[in-house]
């Protein structure tokens, strides 16, 4: 008895909670509810003939046309727009038996899915397929009231909607601009890398040429020093020999003068004169040979002096060339320092690029994980579709039996037809759940894409 009492209390508590929720919904419906004439007038204003009598005794085709107009106005969706997707779904599910679900019913089911999403946004959370096929006055008044109030609210917020739409367009344009700037930065980075490689080759060539010029400069300096030493030695030898020549010339003149003085004395003794003459001839020959040798030596020294003058000019040209080479070396050193600074800047940017590549690899791994998750969702959807296919096969068998027994079991066939409709509704719910899962996966992918673009933006700021 105590157990039954607790169950009774729980049932009454649940019933009271349900009654309070129902009462709150009724109050909301009463606030949103519009008169029949106002609803009919609003529908007439959109271009569809409609009266209060049509609302009291609704025609499903007319009601579907009104719903289709509202869906086209608010969502740009009609039966024709959902036909390709429903046809593809029918081909996947029904396979070789596309006539199981008629075309009109199929399109109406797809339109119902889109319309129910609109109704949930409008506040009608209990919208069913029966509201399209078998509408009632109370349901239509509630649904149309919510729809019309939603349209009025939307028209009053047109400026805000346009503002958010413009912000979205600006964001898309900004994303495209940033993407193009990223491409340009990557191209500039590649060009800088190519120019770095080209500059490295030029720097190596200039360093090699610089080393060759340094070696040649050192060799020319050594040659200059040797030539200068030889020139100094030759000049000293020339001065010494000129002094000797002048001394011997002076001695020869003095000797001649002495000969002239001694000539009268020599005339007195022929023998002594002959001997003196012989001696003087020998001395003269020796002096003459020495003078010829000295003249030859002087000519040789003059030739050497001219040669040294030419060599001195060459040395001056070499010195000028060395000065030019030193200027070129200074320029090369400046270019080398500039190239080193550029190389450091490029290495720093290379480090930034490596960091970006690491970030990109991390994002690629995250993207791969999300792709795997999406693939798992697709496999799950495929499994559910296979289950639905098996269920459809069962329904075909049931339909075949119903056709055979239609004449004698009309009432049983009606009950089975209702069961088939319920099964189709479950299939539609299942398809909607699959679409919701795919939509959520797509939203996750968009979030991941926005994160990637954010990282790219941060990378561009760093660059």
Curated annotation (Swiss-Prot):
Q: Where is the composition biased (Polar residues)?
A: 1-14
Q: Which Pfam families match?
A: Nuf2, Nuf2_DHR10-like
Q: Which GO terms describe its cellular component?
A: Ndc80 complex; nucleus
Coiled coil located at which positions?
166-455
Give the start-end ranges of region Disordered.
1-26, 331-354
Tell me which InterPro entries the record gives: Kinetochore_Nuf2_N, Nuf2_DHR10-like, Nuf2_N_sf
Say if the entry is tagged with keyword Nucleus. yes
Which cell locations does it reside in? Answer: Nucleus; Chromosome, Centromere, Kinetochore
Q: Which GO terms describe its molecular function?
A: microtubule binding; protein-containing complex binding
Q: Which UniProt keywords apply?
A: Cell cycle, Cell division, Centromere, Chromosome, Coiled coil, Kinetochore, Mitosis, Nucleus
Main location (coarse class): nucleus
Q: Where is the composition biased (Basic and acidic residues)?
A: 337-354
Which domain of life, per UniProt? Eukaryota
Q: For this chain's UniProt record, which GO biological process terms are given?
A: attachment of mitotic spindle microtubules to kinetochore; cell division; kinetochore organization; meiotic chromosome segregation; mitotic spindle organization
Disulphides: none
The similarity comment for this entry is: Belongs to the NUF2 family.
- Name this polypeptide is given: Probable kinetochore protein nuf2
Q: Which organism is it from?
A: Aspergillus fumigatus (strain ATCC MYA-4609 / CBS 101355 / FGSC A1100 / Af293)
Q: What is the lineage of its organism?
A: Eukaryota, Fungi, Dikarya, Ascomycota, Pezizomycotina
């Amino acid at each position: 008895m105590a157990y039954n009492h607790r169950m009774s209390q729980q049932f009454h508590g649940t019933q009271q909670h349900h009654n309070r929720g129902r009462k709150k919904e009724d109050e909301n419906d009463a606030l949103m509810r519009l008169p029949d004439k106002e609803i009919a007038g609003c529908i007439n204003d959109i271009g569809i003939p409609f009266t209060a009598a049509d609302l009291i005794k609704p025609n499903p085709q007319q009601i579907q046309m009104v719903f289709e107009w509202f869906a086209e106005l608010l969502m740009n969706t009609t039966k024709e727009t959902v036909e390709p997707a429903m046809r593809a779904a029918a081909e996947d599910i029904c396979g070789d038996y596309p006539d199981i679900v008629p075309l009109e019913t199929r399109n109406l089911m797809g339109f119902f899915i889109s319309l129910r999403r609109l109704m949930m946004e409008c506040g009608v959370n209990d919208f069913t397929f029966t509201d399209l096929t078998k509408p009632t006055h109370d349901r239509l008044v509630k649904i149309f009231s919510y729809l019309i109030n939603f349209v009025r609210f939307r028209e009053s917020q047109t400026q805000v909607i346009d503002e958010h739409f413009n912000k979205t367009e600006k964001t898309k344009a900004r994303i495209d601009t940033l993407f193009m700037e990223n491409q340009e930065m990557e191209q500039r980075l590649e060009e800088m890398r190519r120019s770095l490689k080209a500059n490295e080759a030029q720097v190596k060539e200039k360093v090699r040429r610089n080393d060759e010029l340094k070696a040649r400069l050192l060799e020319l300096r050594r040659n200059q020093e040797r030539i200068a030493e030889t020139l100094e030695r030759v000049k000293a030898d020339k001065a010494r020999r000129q002094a000797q020549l002048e001394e011997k010339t002076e001695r020869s003149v003095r000797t001649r003068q002495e000969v002239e003085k001694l000539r009268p004395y020599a005339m007195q003794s022929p023998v002594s004169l002959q001997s003196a003459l012989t001696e003087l001839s020998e001395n003269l020959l020796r002096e003459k040979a020495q003078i010829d040798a000295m003249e030859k030596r002087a000519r040789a020294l003059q030739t050497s002096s001219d040669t040294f003058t030419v060599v001195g000019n060459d040395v001056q040209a070499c010195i000028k060339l060395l000065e030019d080479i030193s200027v070129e070396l200074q320029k090369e050193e400046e270019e080398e320092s500039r190239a080193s600074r550029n190389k450091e800047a490029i290495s720093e940017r290379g480090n930034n690029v490596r960091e970006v590549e690491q970030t990109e690899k991390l994002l690629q791994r995250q993207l791969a994980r999300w792709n795997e998750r999406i693939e798992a969702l697709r496999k799950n959807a495929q499994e559910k579709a296979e289950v639905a296919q098996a269920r459809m096969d069962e329904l075909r068998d049931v339909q075949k039996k119903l056709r055979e027994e239609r004449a004698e079991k009309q009432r049983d066939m009606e009950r089975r037809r209702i069961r088939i409709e319920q099964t189709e509704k479950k299939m539609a719910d299942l398809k909607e759940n699959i679409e919701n899962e795919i939509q959520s996966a797509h939203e996750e992918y968009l979030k991941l894409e926005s994160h990637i673009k954010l990282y790219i933006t941060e990378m561009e700021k760093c660059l």
